[in-house]
């Protein structure tokens, strides 16, 4: 039968095997085999290709070399033979629309391999004349594409390229087929071909269909001919399956629907698990009474159209051509896995017992009623299902017992083994109205776009790039960073881990037995029912462990009975055994206090559901009793775990999914450890003391997406499938390019990624050192101004944050992710908002900041290189005598040894002049007497020689009385002169003491003033510290605010949002799938709300920081680089002098120096003067103000001009005024409605309030007496008291300084100071005599030693003289020994 089917499929195209394949264009011959090979049709296949394709008609080619134009065009194709000549193509609207996009393509003459063409899709300002281009410069605006593309075409290869458009779909036929989605209304083309052998043009106006027969791979296995009959049906319904089981991208999905069990998507995009992975496509153009058996356990027999996959189907899709109605007499028989055969039948009669069954294929005018037909050994039962739609286009049957008609689920049964289709034949051989296809498919995750309930296009989510697009619910993504989920490889059955404290564990079974019997005429009546629990009506667990087992003993003489449970308990009968823990657990068939209920239902084959029994569970939470799937008894640690793989765990009551890893840590306290959000981080095995970490099975990663490919991944894991891994601060980066990125196309914060996937830090913008000359000048500071420093902090950027929505909400739970697909748009909005805001901020910050390495080095004192400066060269060394104020000569060291130094007090230069005159001679003592202030004086120190001289003079004068009395005059004069010296010395000392006291008192006054300044400095410092504290507080708030927001976001994970638990895995372990979905949906909604709040806060912060960044740029330009003329802009209050800026965390800290005014003068300002009604004058300078001042006599008024910046009144001069046209002041009358046109931000508050009040409903407010009025006021008492306390503390400090100043003023000391005079006195004569005697003795002794020793000494000579008399016997001579040095 399969051979017959494929024979009729091949019959219409058999003549193509012998038809000529050549195409004549412009007197040259080519073919379309290479062109059709771009469709990648897998052999063997017979398909019809339809659309805007090139025609084989030779007259449709344009062969001229001039400019050709055409309208109403939907595509243009170019045929290339050889010669490498160029061409120009322009595509636009007609009439031309400058607000729309136009396409321009130009290829210059170049036959080499480096040939390029320039393609532009831009908004051109006017209708341009077609012409060549040489670069990327264009007059177009808002270009979507403006690049050079490869355009090398090999000679003699029958190349055909082109571009077609239809609505929003643009198809490019180049080296392969590319599809783009661009909204356009193109209809006019203009072309120019430089040589007809290189660029013969063909314009396409209408669709063209080709019958394509692919017998083998390659161009030689392609045969084609124009399709002439039933072309639309073939093209819309038949395709050749790709090698990977995918449906070709160009397929129209005619009569293919999105399967749904509830509501049907009308328009939009959705990620869904659908039977779209094709194993085999059977194309049957003719039906000849088939009764075909399709098994879900084996592959489909027959010849598949396109590629075939050896895989058992999960769903069979029957695609029907609805051009006319074909009554498929018979039914669809469903063979269940239980061995029961059920029939899906339809009839236009509502009475199935009298109906003739037939399933209409196509459109019908009468309704058809569908039933489920069940045949038993003695009767037939029909169960009504639904009414068929007026037009049947597709029927889908899955192995899971689902039957879909036009995408809607009509029937849901258990597992199926096979399905049988029974139809009768009809029509003639050339009648293909019953054409249909059968597709053997499997379920796969896919992104599906639906328009009007029909599938428009799909994207299979089976590779990393496609999975990324599916997660973003987008067929096309912009370049950027996107979150992806990295899941460890799992087996189908995940291992289970259970950890608890060691204890004595006994075990018991809770056996629940449900007995029921169905009978009666309808076979749906419950005849008997009984339920026992371990043989009784109730049972309470009294062991440490237990296992619930449920037994059904249900009988029905008419067929099988299915069962189900309905529970309002936080668990099911099956999930209790999944290591759920309790403190108390009882079950009963009768009502218990505070118990929850589980109802058990039975569903007979041909009736409605009946409640068999109700079980009541009374329990309390705890860890005393644990449900286990099997007994775990004994005094032992019954814990078991699987390490280093993804496992489902129950650890000390925590349920979840993660990877358990042994660590080297040792923790004394506790047995399990959680995060702030309640997530399990680690636990300790109390038996061994080992600490194990618990990490998620899936990790959030960021994929770098560039040019429709993932070029790199930012991950917290060190292992990856990429070839290169780089460890960066805080994460690992995986890519196939390990080089450093220098030209990033993606920028996120300070990280950039290149097209190749390499990563690097974004290079800073470097600026040249700006050399500004230093200008000095004198300025005048008003006395009523005070200088102050104001601090201001402006934030420049935020710390970028990226949130993986799926990971945050579901924490890797697969079922939760399926539910989250309903909220995929919300997740995409959240993630894209954060990503785009962070990238925009990164671009703005990087373009704002520039770095100068030289300026940075000069500005940093720690790195300033000052080694070349030797300041010691300018420091000289000299001996200075502070007493004389001159450089004096000091005695040598030897002189200090030979003389005694006596320190006395002297008068100025008296001692020095005396020493210079006497030159050490005692007899010149009186001769060298000095005069000081007219009084003769002598130095007060007398040496021994002078003492003996004056003593001899005194004795001589006393010896002979009056005769020798004159000899005592020298003594008298010397004594008087020395007494005068002492008297004058005393006077000088007193005057010096007075000067010193005055100087000390002046110093005390200066110290007092200094303390006054210190007091004022403390006050100013207090104010300065206060302003700096405010700035630092703002910096701290900026740095900590984002961390607080993230912490708050994390805390939300421990909230259950009215679900039974905040753990998703715990919910699914306790409840059945439907009940758990309801609970998890609450968690999803709550966590998405928390994410939305966080994103809204973050986006608001981005907006604030963007405004702050712009303000910082203005303040740098106006305050730092220049002097601001705006009052209060730099510093908040006062006239700006200069500003300094310093880098701060995430921003800039400004230090503004301003003049703050203290006093103000109120004047009456005048805008202008009008003289005699003829001359009108106004001030020339805008910074001046004209005002009046009445004289004290009130007899006249004076006019003054002053600067607005400082009150400096002066008489006006002629140069201050400028004459204007007239004294008439012109006003423009506006209504309140017109004022916003002039002042857009003007708001009429009164009118707005009136409108609000008018819109309020007229109601009488309640009477609220004041005695019951409760108002809450902002209490700032504590803050005010703290400020007053600080002020009082500063005042007390000031008073203490004042007390110290008074004490210093009262401490005036009269000091006595005596000048120091150094006088050297010679030793007496007997000292010198002793010295001479000692020297003579020493010298004599040395001379004697020298002449008395040695062979030439005197003793030796004397000995030789007397040798003859005293010589003894001669001794034998001896040989002298030579010294020998042995090395």
Swiss-Prot record:
Subcellular location: Virion membrane; Host endoplasmic reticulum-Golgi intermediate compartment membrane
Highest taxon in the source lineage: Viruses
Renumbered ranges of motif KxHxx: 1379-1383
Keyword terms of this UniProt record: Coiled coil, Glycoprotein, Host membrane, Host-virus interaction, Membrane, Signal, Transmembrane, Transmembrane helix, Viral attachment to host cell, Viral envelope protein, Virion, Virulence, Virus entry into host cell
Pfam assignment, any one: CoV_S1_C
Membrane topology note: Single-pass type I membrane protein
Segments of this protein annotated with the region Fusion peptide: 955-975
TM stretches of this protein: 1325-1344
BP GO terms, sorted: endocytosis involved in viral entry into host cell; fusion of virus membrane with host endosome membrane; fusion of virus membrane with host plasma membrane; receptor-mediated virion attachment to host cell
Annotated stretches, region: Heptad repeat 1 (HR1): 969-1088
InterPro entries: ALPHA_CORONA_SPIKE, CoV_S1_C, S2_sf_CoV, Spike_S1_CoV, Spike_S2_CoV, Spike_S2_CoV_C, Spike_S2_CoV_HR1, Spike_S2_CoV_HR2
GO cellular component: host cell endoplasmic reticulum-Golgi intermediate compartment membrane; membrane; viral envelope; virion membrane
Residue intervals annotated with topology Intravirion: 1345-1383
Signal peptide, first to last residue: 1-25
Main location group: virion
UniProt-annotated stretches for the region S1: 26-734
Chain intervals for the UniProt region annotation (Interaction with host ANPEP): 617-745
Spans within the Virion surface topological domain: 26-1324
Family to which the UniProt record says this protein belongs: Belongs to the alphacoronaviruses spike protein family.
UniProt name for this protein: Spike glycoprotein
Gene: S
């Amino acid at each position: 039968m399969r051979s017959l089917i494929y024979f009729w499929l091949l019959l219409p195209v058999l003549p193509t095997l012998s038809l000529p394949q050549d195409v004549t264009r412009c007197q040259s011959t080519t073919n379309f085999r290479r062109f059709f090979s771009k469709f990648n049709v897998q052999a063997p296949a017979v398909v019809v290709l339809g659309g805007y394709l090139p025609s084989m008609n030779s007259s449709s080619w344009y062969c001229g070399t001039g400019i050709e134009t055409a309208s109403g065009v939907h595509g243009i194709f170019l045929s290339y033979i050889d010669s490498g000549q160029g061409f120009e193509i322009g595509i636009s609207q007609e009439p031309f629309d400058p607000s729309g996009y136009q396409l321009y393509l130009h290829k210059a003459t170049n036959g080499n391999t480096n040939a390029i063409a320039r393609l532009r899709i831009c908004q051109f300002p006017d209708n341009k004349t077609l012409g060549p281009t040489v670069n990327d410069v264009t007059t177009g605006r808002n270009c979507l594409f403006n690049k050079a593309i490869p355009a090398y075409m090999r000679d003699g290869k029958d190349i055909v390229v082109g571009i077609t458009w239809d609505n929003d779909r643009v198809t490019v036929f180049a080296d392969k087929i590319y599809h783009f989605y661009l909204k356009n209304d193109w209809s006019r083309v203009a072309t120019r071909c430089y040589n007809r052998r290189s660029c013969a043009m063909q314009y396409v106006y209408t669709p063209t269909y080709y019958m394509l027969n692919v017998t083998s791979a390659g161009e030689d296995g392609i045969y084609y001919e124009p399709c002439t009959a039933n072309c639309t049906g073939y093209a819309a319904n038949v395709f050749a399956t790709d090698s990977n089981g995918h449906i070709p991208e160009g397929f129209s999905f005619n009569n293919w629907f999105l399967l749904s069990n509830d509501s049907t998507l009308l328009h939009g995009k959705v990620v869904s698990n659908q039977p779209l992975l094709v194993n085999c496509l059977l194309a049957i153009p003719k039906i000849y009474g088939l009764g075909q058996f399709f098994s879900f356990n084996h592959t489909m027999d027959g010849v598949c159209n396109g590629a075939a996959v050896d895989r058992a189907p999960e769903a069979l899709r029957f695609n029907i051509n609805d051009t006319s109605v074909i009554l498929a007499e018979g039914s669809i028989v469903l063979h269940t896995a239980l061995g029961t055969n059920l029939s899906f039948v339809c009839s236009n009669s509502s009475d199935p017992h009298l109906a003739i069954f037939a399933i209409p294929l196509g459109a019908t005018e009468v309704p058809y009623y569908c039933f489920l037909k069940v045949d038993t050994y003695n009767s037939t039962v029909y169960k009504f299902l639904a009414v068929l739609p007026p037009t049947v286009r597709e029927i889908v049957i899955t192995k899971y017992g689902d039957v879909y008609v036009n995408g809607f689920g009509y029937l849901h049964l258990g597992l199926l083994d096979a399905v049988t289709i029974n139809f009768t034949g009809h029509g003639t051989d050339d009648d293909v109205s019953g054409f249909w296809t059968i597709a053997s498919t499997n379920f796969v995750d896919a992104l599906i776009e639906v328009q009007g309930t029909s599938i428009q296009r799909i994207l299979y989510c089976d590779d990393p790039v496609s999975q990324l697009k599916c997660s973003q619910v987008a067929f096309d993504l912009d370049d950027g960073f996107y979150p992806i989920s990295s899941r460890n490889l799992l087996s189908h059955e995940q291992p289970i881990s259970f950890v608890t404290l060691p204890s004595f564990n006994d075990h018991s079974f809770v056996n629940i037995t449900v007995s029921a019997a169905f009978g009666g005429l309808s076979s749906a009546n419950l005849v008997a029912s009984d339920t026992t629990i371990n043989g009784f009506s109730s049972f309470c667990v009294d062991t440490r462990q237990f296992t619930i087992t449920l037994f059904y003993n249900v009988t029905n003489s008419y067929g099988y009975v299915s069962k189900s449970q309905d529970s309002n308990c936080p668990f099911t009968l099956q999930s209790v055994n999944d290591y759920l823990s309790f403190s108390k657990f009882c079950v009963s068939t009768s009502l218990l206090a505070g118990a929850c209920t589980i109802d058990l239902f039975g569903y007979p084959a041909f009736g409605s559901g009946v409640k068999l029994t109700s079980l009541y569970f009374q329990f309390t939470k705890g860890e005393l009793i644990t449900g286990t799937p099997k007994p775990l008894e004994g005094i032992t640690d019954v814990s078991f775990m699987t390490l280093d793989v993804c496992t489902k765990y129950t650890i000390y009551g925590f349920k979840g999914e993660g990877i358990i890893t042994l660590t080297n840590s040792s923790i004394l306290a506790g047995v399990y450890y959680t995060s702030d959000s309640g997530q399990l981080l680690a636990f300790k095995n109390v038996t061994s003391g080992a600490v194990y970490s618990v990490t998620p099975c899936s990790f959030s990663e960021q994929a770098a997406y560039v040019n429709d490919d993932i070029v790199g991944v930012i991950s917290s894991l060190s292992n990856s499938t990429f070839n290169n891994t780089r460890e960066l601060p805080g994460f690992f980066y995986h890519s196939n390019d390990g080089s450093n990125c220098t030209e990033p196309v993606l920028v996120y914060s300070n990280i950039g990624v290149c097209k190749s996937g390499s990563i690097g830090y974004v290079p800073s913008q470097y600026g040249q050192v700006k050399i500004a000359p230093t200008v000095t000048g004198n300025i005048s500071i008003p006395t009523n101004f005070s200088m102050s420093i104001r601090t201001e902090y402006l934030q420049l950027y935020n710390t970028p944050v990226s949130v993986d929505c799926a990971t945050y909400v579901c924490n890797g739970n697969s079922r939760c992710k399926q539910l989250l697909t309903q909220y995929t748009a919300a997740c995409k909005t959240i993630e894209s908002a954060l990503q785009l805001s962070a990238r925009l901020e990164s671009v703005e910050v990087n373009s704002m900041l520039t770095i100068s390495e030289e300026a940075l080095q000069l500005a940093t004192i720690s790195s300033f290189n000052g080694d070349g400066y030797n300041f010691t060269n300018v420091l000289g060394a000299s001996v200075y005598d502070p007493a004389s104020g001159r450089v004096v000569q000091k005695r040598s060291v030897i002189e200090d040894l030979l003389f005694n130094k006596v320190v006395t007090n002297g008068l100025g230069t008296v001692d020095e002049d005396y020493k210079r005159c006497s030159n050490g001679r005692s007899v010149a003592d009186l001769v060298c007497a000095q005069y000081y202030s007219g009084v003769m004086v002598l130095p007060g120190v007398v040496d021994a020689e002078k003492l003996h001289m004056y003593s001899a003079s005194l004795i001589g004068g006393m010896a002979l009385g009056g005769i020798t009395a004159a000899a005592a005059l020298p003594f008298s004069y010397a004594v008087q002169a020395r007494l005068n010296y002492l008297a004058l010395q005393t006077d000088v000392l007193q005057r010096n003491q007075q000067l010193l006291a005055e100087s000390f008192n002046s110093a005390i006054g200066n110290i007092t003033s200094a303390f006054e300044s210190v007091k004022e400095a403390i006050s100013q410092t207090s104010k300065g510290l206060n302003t700096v504290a405010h700035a630092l507080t703002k910096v701290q708030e900026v740095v900590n605010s984002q961390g607080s927001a993230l912490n708050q976001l994390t805390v939300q994970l421990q909230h259950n949002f009215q679900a039974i638990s905040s753990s998703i895995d715990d919910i699914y372990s306790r409840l059945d799938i439907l009940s758990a979905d309801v609970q998890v949906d609450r968690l999803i909604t709550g966590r998405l709300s928390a994410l939305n709040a966080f994103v809204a806060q973050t986006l608001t912060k981005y907006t604030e920081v963007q405004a702050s960044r712009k303000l910082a740029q203005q303040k740098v330009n106006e305050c730092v680089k220049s002097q601001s003329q705006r009052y209060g802009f730099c510093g908040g209050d006062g006239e700006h002098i200069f500003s300094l800026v310093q880098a701060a965390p995430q921003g800039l800290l400004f230090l503004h120096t301003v003049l703050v005014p203290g006093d103000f003068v109120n004047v009456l300002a005048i805008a202008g003067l009008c003289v005699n009604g003829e001359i009108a004058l106004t001030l020339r300078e805008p910074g001046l103000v004209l005002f009046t001042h009445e004289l004290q006599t009130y007899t006249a008024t004076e006019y003054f001009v002053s600067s607005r910046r400082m009150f400096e009144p002066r008489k006006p001069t002629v140069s201050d005024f400028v004459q204007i046209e007239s004294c008439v002041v012109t006003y423009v009358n506006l209504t309140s409605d017109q004022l916003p046109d002039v002042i857009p931000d003007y708001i009429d508050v009164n009118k707005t309030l009136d409108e609000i009040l008018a819109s309020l409903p007229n109601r009488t407010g309640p009477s609220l007496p004041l005695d019951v009025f409760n108002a809450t006021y902002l209490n700032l008492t504590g803050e005010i008291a703290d400020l007053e306390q600080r002020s009082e503390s500063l005042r007390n400090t000031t008073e203490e300084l004042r007390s110290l100043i008074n004490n210093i003023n009262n401490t005036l000391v009269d000091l006595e100071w005596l000048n120091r005079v150094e006088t050297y006195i010679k030793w007496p004569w007997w000292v010198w005599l002793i010295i001479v005697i000692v020297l003579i003795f020493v010298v004599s002794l040395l001379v004697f030693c020298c002449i008395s020793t040695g062979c030439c000494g005197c003793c030796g000579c004397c000995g030789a003289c007397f040798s003859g008399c005293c010589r003894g016997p001669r001794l034998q001579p001896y040989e002298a020994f030579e010294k020998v040095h042995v090395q």
